[in-house]
Amino acid sequence: MSQYFTLFRIEPAFDIGTENLEQTYRALAARFHPDKFASASAFEQKQAVMMSSTINDAYRTLKNPIDRAAYLLKTSGIDADAPEHTSFAPDFLMQQMEWRETLMEARAGNNLESLKNLDNEIRAEQEKLFCGLKQSFARQDCDTAAQQVRQGRFLDKLRHEISSAL
């Protein structure tokens, strides 16, 4: 299941070097670009399209820390995104409500400064979460990592909503 890591010749881990990931992606994308197989057989063309799609999926997954963490958990048989794993700690739920309220008020008042401040706050929370994920994986604490992935999904979604409002 660590196919994406194998494809990019990276040891399966949460903490990976994104520079190497980027370089390997460019090399693989160029090598398997479907246009290079324009004069090849239909089978080879189809294989190139499938490989190109896999390369793109792998890159997107490994580049995003939350997607990478979820993928790592799946390699251990844990689906952090499964519907039965949607609970959050009470303090995180309270914080979510506060952030949502701040977002709604900033949108309603078209307050760009509040939106930017909220975005900075969420970005800082994401950085703390990434450090926590690194520690969870180092301790092989998959349950905590799964909870952190769910929190990260929420933070990603909230940042997307903030970006849309800006």
Swiss-Prot record:
<dbReference type="InterPro" id="IPR036386">
    <property type="entry name" value="HscB_C_sf"/>
</dbReference>
<dbReference type="GO" id="GO:0044571">
    <property type="term" value="P:[2Fe-2S] cluster assembly"/>
</dbReference>
<dbReference type="GO" id="GO:0006457">
    <property type="term" value="P:protein folding"/>
</dbReference>
<dbReference type="GO" id="GO:0051259">
    <property type="term" value="P:protein complex oligomerization"/>
</dbReference>
<comment type="function">
    <text>Co-chaperone involved in the maturation of iron-sulfur cluster-containing proteins. Seems to help targeting proteins to be folded toward HscA.</text>
</comment>
<protein>
    <recommendedName>
        <fullName>Co-chaperone protein HscB homolog</fullName>
    </recommendedName>
</protein>
<dbReference type="Pfam" id="PF00226">
    <property type="entry name" value="DnaJ"/>
</dbReference>
<feature type="domain" description="J">
    <location>
        <begin position="3"/>
        <end position="75"/>
    </location>
</feature>
<comment type="similarity">
    <text>Belongs to the HscB family.</text>
</comment>
<dbReference type="InterPro" id="IPR001623">
    <property type="entry name" value="DnaJ_domain"/>
</dbReference>
<dbReference type="InterPro" id="IPR004640">
    <property type="entry name" value="HscB"/>
</dbReference>
<dbReference type="GO" id="GO:0051087">
    <property type="term" value="F:protein-folding chaperone binding"/>
</dbReference>
<comment type="subunit">
    <text>Interacts with HscA and stimulates its ATPase activity.</text>
</comment>
<dbReference type="InterPro" id="IPR036869">
    <property type="entry name" value="J_dom_sf"/>
</dbReference>
<dbReference type="GO" id="GO:1990230">
    <property type="term" value="C:iron-sulfur cluster transfer complex"/>
</dbReference>
<dbReference type="Pfam" id="PF07743">
    <property type="entry name" value="HSCB_C"/>
</dbReference>
<dbReference type="InterPro" id="IPR009073">
    <property type="entry name" value="HscB_oligo_C"/>
</dbReference>
<keyword id="KW-0143">Chaperone</keyword>
<dbReference type="GO" id="GO:0001671">
    <property type="term" value="F:ATPase activator activity"/>
</dbReference>
